[in-house]
């Protein structure tokens, strides 16, 4: 490809609205342009990277026996109503109404569509298991699109769905897809860590996310410093063995705390440690009120709360609701003499002796509060976020944190969708059974951004060879010099004939501009044709290491091939 005809509008300045490196570099390297918030046009460089990623995905999935299909982007509301997700999915589901007043959704995922297809196509155990996949654009009405391709409203995704007669078959497919994902990300040059995760709006139980480690990651990974344990912080279990300090129980006292309403303010006012304070939160759990208790130095994990109680809807009470239910303002509520609500506590409360809590009275708190004597807990559960330094849940080492970008996730859905949409099969005994399902997603466009987050330097992108838009960037440093253009053109064609993807910079620009753009675009190897062109020599630079060597044109093809092989290892 000759750059003079190639749509790659590079930029010198960092765009003001681009907060993360991948977004900045994709804009500056002429890979994408924004159409609206969270919506982008993919220019030729980006499309070439995406095609290479898609090729890796297809190769690995085809080897597992998965079959590629294409499903519609537009979904009738009736399918989503059957599954119950028309309302449950919330505002992120993009909905529209056609001219006949029929409702549709732009698909964020395809569980409903694929389940209805298999329901109508397969009815015997002899046709199972089955695994199908597609690669297409998805849509989510993100409240706050940001970070370029990391959180957009339209994005490219690979989604796969498997159907099974039993749990053993599903477990086998889950392992097959888990391993395929590991190979896909490794081949794409991504440093990825699989972590235990929450299934969210997709549903099901067992699930793992594949996290690309990066400073800008929106997800926090909790991992052991001495084992392979890793989980999304939302799902990391707390295994602290709490014990009560051996202290004499002091008499409870009511004290004035003025305008101190936060944990920190109360701790400072009373000169106590935050871990001595009982944090009380009024929460609506499936439309019933509960008082949630945590230690002052701990934070409520609403995912854990939802799982612990088997709840579908959880929200914090408003200030008005706290006043109506408890009779006081936020910041002064507590478990002593509270009536009409269930009291649910995190295990950390067991470690508090002579603690502090709100007195359910304006500007007042109790000190020297003790469970059993002063209040009763109805249920204990693991309700808090794990913290760095906590014991690892597997009993090996302590917990450390890292940031990650979710690039893939695998789910065991079970019968969540098949039962609701009636996807059944006849077993060996002729009995109707619901199919067990798995689903498996990869964020293809997000992978592009994740690769850049992990592979860049101060000058631009540093593409891994497997997903680079081209293998080699040939620069004709002075297009007015006939010998340079002649050699550059010869080098360009000889590399192409060797089966390499080559970009030839034949623009009438200064050499400095070409070098800057080459570093910014970040192809694995650069071949500069300059002053020694009349002798047949060119300069080869390895983008990743900065190594520069002079090579005669007659030896260029084997040299380039050897360098690419070294980079791929």
UniProtKB/Swiss-Prot annotation:
Transmembrane segments: none annotated. GO terms for molecular function: aminoacyl-tRNA deacylase activity; ATP binding; catalytic activity, acting on a protein; proline-tRNA ligase activity; transferase activity. The keyword Ribonucleoprotein does not apply. It is an enzyme of class 6 (ligase). Its EC number is 6.1.1.15. One of its GO terms (biological process) is prolyl-tRNA aminoacylation. One of its GO terms (cellular component) is cytosol. Pfam families: HGTP_anticodon, tRNA-synt_2b, tRNA_edit. It is found in: Cytoplasm. It catalyses: tRNA(Pro) + L-proline + ATP = L-prolyl-tRNA(Pro) + AMP + diphosphate. The keyword DNA repair does not apply. Its main location: cytoplasm. Keywords: Aminoacyl-tRNA synthetase, ATP-binding, Cytoplasm, Ligase, Nucleotide-binding, Protein biosynthesis. InterPro entries: aa-tRNA-synt_IIb, aa-tRNA-synth_II, aa-tRNA-synth_II/BPL/LPL, Anticodon-bd, Anticodon-bd_dom_sf, Pro-tRNA-ligase_IIa, Pro-tRNA-synth_IIa_bac-type, Pro-tRNA-Synthase_IIa_type1. Homodimer. Catalyzes the attachment of proline to tRNA(Pro) in a two-step reaction: proline is first activated by ATP to form Pro-AMP and then transferred to the acceptor end of tRNA(Pro). As ProRS can inadvertently accommodate and process non-cognate amino acids such as alanine and cysteine, to avoid such errors it has two additional distinct editing activities against alanine. One activity is designated as 'pretransfer' editing and involves the tRNA(Pro)-independent hydrolysis of activated Ala-AMP. Consists of three domains: the N-terminal catalytic domain, the editing domain and the C-terminal anticodon-binding domain. Belongs to the class-II aminoacyl-tRNA synthetase family. ProS type 1 subfamily. This is Proline--tRNA ligase. It comes from Halalkalibacterium halodurans (strain ATCC BAA-125 / DSM 18197 / FERM 7344 / JCM 9153 / C-125). The gene is proS.
